[in-house]
Amino acid sequence: MAITNNVGSLKIQITNNNFFPIEGASVYISPTGMPDSTSEEFVTDENGIVIDEELPAPDVAYSLEPGENQPYSEYNVLVNAPGYNERFISGVQIFSGENGIQNIELTPSDGSDTNPTVLDAHTLWEQYPPKIAEDMIKPVNPSGGIVLSRVVIPETIVVHDGAPTDPTARDYYVPYKDYIKNVACNEIYSTWPDAAIRANVLAIQSFTLNRVYTEWYRGKGYDFTVTSNTAFDQKWVYNATIFENVSQIVDEMFANYLSKPNVTQPLFTQYCDGRRVSCPGWMTQWGSKSLADDGLTAIQILRYYYGDTIYINTSETISGIPSSYPGYELTIGSSGDKVSQLQRQLARISLNYPAIGTVTVDGLYGQNTADAVRKFQQIFNLPATGVTDYKTWYKISQIYVGVTKIAENV
């Protein structure tokens, strides 16, 4: 989607708590802090989607160097649909030239008042507590510590939305990829060079997988994986806006993490902004952006900060997925069991998203399958090629698992 200067776009996707898109919902978008402004009204299509391509935003230059000007504009989103409770989200972030994605789940009407969701400001703009330093490599057996024998990509991250010791903070169960996308969109700007985004995503993933692998908080008696408190972990914001380019990078790289020779655990790759806070031996976010401007690749940026011996590793074990990627793209002319598996999953997803169309399960990747894949990609924010690549395969698997699990629990 082409976006002109000083505007960004927002794609709002509305579902109910059974993962069905809500058609005909009224969506109102207005700038925050401007009570007299006129709200733009939209109505969701059969996929529960509306897109506003013309939301004013500050000059992109504000997000490319630290400064005194807020680099994003903020909007309110109000959603009404017959039979559902109203939702109001304030603080939706829009960057010039970027495609934002706002997922909103509606719950059945129960007569309760609207409970506004106010999104936190970005970490590079707002001041948050600096990270308390920890070792990059954890002791192997601190009082019965590390128990996993291999690195596993978890299906779900349990996020404690506060400090570890805060018993009033809510725990959220978040799909792993969604957690990584959320953190990345709250820790760095989506306007940065591709190499900088990739370097930071890899650091975020390795940080997270170290928490998973070491069972860091469970070993301390807590029932969560990570916190949202920046003094202890990474910034995660409930219902935050996700940016399309960051989302696609995570879909491509989600099974990767950072390693050193002869070390099994993912490295605990800590970082800071590098301007308001200094952190020798860690990656700095603004520094990674400068190195990307100079032409360094993601791994070169990471080695600059974490040492020449680190390398990108890949987990072969992805939890909660019915079948692993075949190792090659599926496209028109492909055939076999993997195509049949893909078709079965698409056919099930199409019960929730009829726009995907009727999918014939015959093990032959023809035009019908390619069209269904293309429509799926359009709905779920992937490049619409009609080809099932790595990121499409695992996105289809994720959505399939989501709709079937919910259906089983209804």
Indicate where each model-derived feature is located.
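Short, solvent-exposed loop/turn segments that connect beta-strands within catalytic domains
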Residues: 33-36, 68-70, 352-355
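Conserved, single-site charged/polar hotspot
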Residues: 1-3, 24-28, 43, 47-56, ...
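Short beta-strand and strand-turn-strand segments in soluble, beta-rich domains
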Residues: 30-39, 86
